[in-house]
Amino acid sequence: MTLPVGVSIGERIGALRVEAGLSQRALAARANVSYSLLTKVEAGHKPASAAFLAAVARALRLKVGDLQPEPYSDGMGPKEPLLPLMAPIRAALDLYDLPPQEDARPRPITALRLAVRRINALAQAADYKPMCAALPGLLAELHAAAHLMTGEDQRQAWGLLAEAYRCGHSVGIAIGLNDMSAAALSRMDWAAQRAGDRAPGLRAAREYLRVTAYLRTGDLDACRRLQDSGRSYLDGTDPKTPGALVAAGQLHLGSAVVAARAQDVDLMTHHLDEAERLAQATGETGDFSLHFGPTNVQVHLVMTLVEASRHDRAVAAAKGMRFPAGWAPTRIGHHHIDLARANRWMARPEAALDHLDAAFAVAPQQASRHPLVRETVSALSRAGGRRSSRLSAWIARTGI
């Protein structure tokens, strides 16, 4: 069934239910969910939790992604301007197992380290056009360095290659190319295995990143399995293992989000507490471009409260927050997206738009594409009343 752009999750469920010939009571009974909750979700008065979506999808014999708007499901819009830049990245990901080109002359490891830091900074700012233009050449250079260098420089080159592969995931997941994201993270693990004492942390970080695609489709079981896998790579490590504490802390933050999606607030709080304990040990750190530390724990507290439908508590927890200089724009942007969601559910449309504007100011490409932004704008557009110029601008920006 093809539905127009901008249709909400609740409206999609209603349309697909009617197509299946089911009344609301019949679907609620088949999915084993509350009839009252189903009616409120369809009407846009309650958010659809991951567990709710999974139950309804099973009852309708559909995938969870079928109930969600793009880009939760695979594929990207036909007007995506980054499309012409994807082919060279895909080629670099595909040709990973070939020997370096004969004329390859990689720069010294110090220069390569700086180049990887710069390209990851572009990814963390959602500045995808220059990142995508530079990524294939940098991957080729790092690939050559990993094969041609020796000793500690070679191990470092493998680690840098793993970090650079992560950028393919960053753009892939942003524009709905989940297959490219998965390929990039597979190559990240391939390189990380050869990175010496950085291997455990990098491999654990890769599992943390893999969760995103499954979280977007509501497959919480897959999320938990990946997080357990990530922790297994840290077995036998200690605080001196490069990146181990950072990866462990980030896995706890990811687990807190999954617990919040499942409405398990006690488990959510446990993981946040564990992340806070590790953040006090690490401080603010840029290891693996994860930006783990006390600030990220606070950001995830707000995020998880939104996911757990504690919207007033989320807004209160965000008061007075300050971000470290140079902190990842996409992290700041996502924080404002979460606050826009909270304010939308609290029937505060102007505050929701304020946070959408703040997200756009810090990371415009992220805010323009993010499925949670599209979902929020779609809900605001259906709320009734006179449509403001700001809301109209967001409708145009997101293509709702």
Stretches with model-predicted labels:
Residues 32, 51-66:
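DNA major-groove recognition helix of helix-turn-helix/homeodomain DNA-binding modules
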Residues 5, 104-400:
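Conserved binding/catalytic microenvironments
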Residues 11-30:
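Short basic helix-loop element that most often maps to the first helix and adjoining turn
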Residues 1-8:
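A detector for short, charged/polar N-terminal pre-domain segments
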Residues 61-77, 297:
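Short C-terminal boundary/hinge segments that cap the last helix of small helical domains
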Residues 31-47, 69-72:
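Recognition helix of helix-turn-helix/homeodomain-like DNA-binding domains
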Residues 26, 37, 47, 52, ...:
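Residues in the helix-turn-helix
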